[in-house]
């Protein structure tokens, strides 16, 4: 019985699941916007948000812990140099999940996962202010 077992399996082995979310998190940190299925997006939140919280406190130990979870030097550097300071005043809720229809092949629900307050959002808000 699976009573009270949290997390989705996605019909993958634990190593495959771990690698998938490691890669998705690194891509999210690098590009700040990714498109994936809705269940994967919801599960990605559980992996990515604690890493951003970790990046708020820049230390060698925290960088090593983040690297052990991401295995990407570029992602860790961006996480601590850009994202940590950006969200230093925000108490969680760093990701936004936007539903974007269904995939053509199998009708799977798709979603965009983006970082809240990413630079393109700020530029769009400034453009809206200029129009008014």
Curated annotation (Swiss-Prot):
Keywords: Ribonucleoprotein, Ribosomal protein. PROSITE patterns: RIBOSOMAL_L17. Transmembrane segments: none annotated. The keyword Mitochondrion does not apply. GO terms for molecular function: structural constituent of ribosome. SUPFAM superfamilies: Prokaryotic ribosomal protein L17. One of its GO terms (biological process) is translation. Gene3D superfamilies: Ribosomal protein L17. GO terms for cellular component: cytosolic large ribosomal subunit. PANTHER family: LARGE RIBOSOMAL SUBUNIT PROTEIN BL17M, RIBOSOMAL PROTEIN L17. Belongs to the bacterial ribosomal protein bL17 family. NCBIfam families: L17. Part of the 50S ribosomal subunit. Contacts protein L32. This is Large ribosomal subunit protein bL17. The lineage of its organism: Bacteria, Pseudomonadati, Pseudomonadota, Gammaproteobacteria, Pseudomonadales.
């Amino acid at each position: 019985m699976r009573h009270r077992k949290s997390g989705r399996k996605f019909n993958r082995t634990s190593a495959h699941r771990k690698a998938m979310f490691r890669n998705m998190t690194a891509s999210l940190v690098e590009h700040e916007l990714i498109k994936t299925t809705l269940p994967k997006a919801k599960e990605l939140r559980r992996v990515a948000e604690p890493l951003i919280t970790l990046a708020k406190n820049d230390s060698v130990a925290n960088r090593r812990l983040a690297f052990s979870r991401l295995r990407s030097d570029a992602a860790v550097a961006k996480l601590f140099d850009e994202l940590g300071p950006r969200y230093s005043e925000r108490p969680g809720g760093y990701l936004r999940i936007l539903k974007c229809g269904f995939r053509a092949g199998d009708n799977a629900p798709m979603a965009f996962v983006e970082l809240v307050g990413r630079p393109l959002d700020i530029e769009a808000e400034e453009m809206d202010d200029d129009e008014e």
